[in-house]
Amino acid sequence: MAAKFLPRFWRSGSQAELLDFQNNNVVAEGKLDFEHGTLKGKSGRYGDDEEDVRRGHIEDLANHSLLNKLLRRTLVDSPHNVEVLQRDPTSPLFSVKSFEELHLKNELLRGIYAMGFNRPSKIQENALPMMLADPPQNLIAQSQSGTGKTAAFVLAMLSRVDANKKYPQCICLSPTFELALQTGKVVEEMGKFCAGIEVIYALRGNRPGKGSRLEAQIVIGTPGTVLDWCFKLRLITVENISVFVLDEADVMINVQGHSDHSVRVKRSMPKSCQMLLFSATFEDSVWAFAERIVPDPNIIKLKKEELTLKNIQQFYDQCENKEQKYSALCNLYGVITIAQAIVFCQTRKIASWLSQKLSDDGHQVALLSGELPVYDRADMIQRFREGREKVLVTTNVCARGIDVEQVSIVVNFDLPVNVDGSVDFETYLHRIGRTGRFGKKGIAVSLIENFFVYMLKEIEDHFNTKITKLNSMDMDEMGKIWK
């Protein structure tokens, strides 16, 4: 008998029911609602650009991860090595080259192969022996998107579950509603041959009655709701939890309340509980958070693909104001339609204004911003990948991890800045890194208002590169950038 994985509010698993569930569970006005993957606020409350930047920055962290999960069809074949730091350096270091070496149950092996995994990814080679060890070992792991880390911790949970015990045994915390559902989808696919194992979603709106008895062995949810289920509703007996997973830690710490709720849930776990934490990045703040969650961990890092500027010609055009930048972009438009192009804006407000103005003036463009539901964003990116859209106006949601080979020019309508107004060097690198992919020549043009010219010098110094001045009003000069 196949396992039952559908939550009570999503019995049929249809997209329509999921969207209906989201639409009928609106939070109070003015609150940031990341359990539903969206920002809901009283109309007009966040009218200034600075607040728009802050909100967009936080939301992009979560949606970037979800978009990559929706868009990737295969694992990333990274050429970089895995760095392993063991809790006990004297212990032998094991890695595996096949799933058979892990001595998994046959039904789990069938599920893995049915998902299309033929061999472990680089992070799985090293992480799985640690995650499946007896006695269990704690783990902190860093990896880029698409390296198979979700499948790795799902395999660990399914391996630890006792199907004969009808109560929660594993908890997985995700920062948003949609990311939790994506993790549940992996559980469903990998565990479809495992009889008697169920999963339930601890998400806002899915509220079993007080005193209800949960029979699902795996609980996937957002921190606040899981905390309520553990202590307010007493649906979960924390002493029975054998595996605690915290996914997307770098997103979690940027969402107000999530980090504190996560720590409170973790502190209630028994000492024997295995702690697994995953993050795409590990700035100091993430490390500090990880250390509060995971005691005595093994640590695994998979180095990110290094972006290079060597194939990218960088230009800038100095403009008086937004309207002059728009005129410069229109002059560029005759050049950028030669191939596919991405135009980056700092805020959703500017992106919406720009795409509408371009459309009104007869230019064919597509808009990708945080105002679109995330599944619509995935569809838009897929259309762009397939060449059905030639020019994409977007915010930073498209700055990382979206590889489109045909993109030959990137335009920064606004330079990327941090919340404090300083240059966001990493986002600049990732933005212009959308062109010049796979060894091809790429072009990046930044449209700079007079007040922000000093930022160009900072970018040049930071990357030890040269950004050439361009006069977008000189069409002869414009044509030369392709030669």
Swiss-Prot record:
Motif interval(s): DEAD box: 247-250
Short motif Q motif, span: 97-125
BP term (GO), one: poly(A)+ mRNA export from nucleus
Residues in Helicase C-terminal domain copies: 311-478
Catalytic activity: ATP + H2O = ADP + phosphate + H(+)
Function: ATP-dependent RNA helicase.
Descriptive protein name: ATP-dependent RNA helicase DDX25
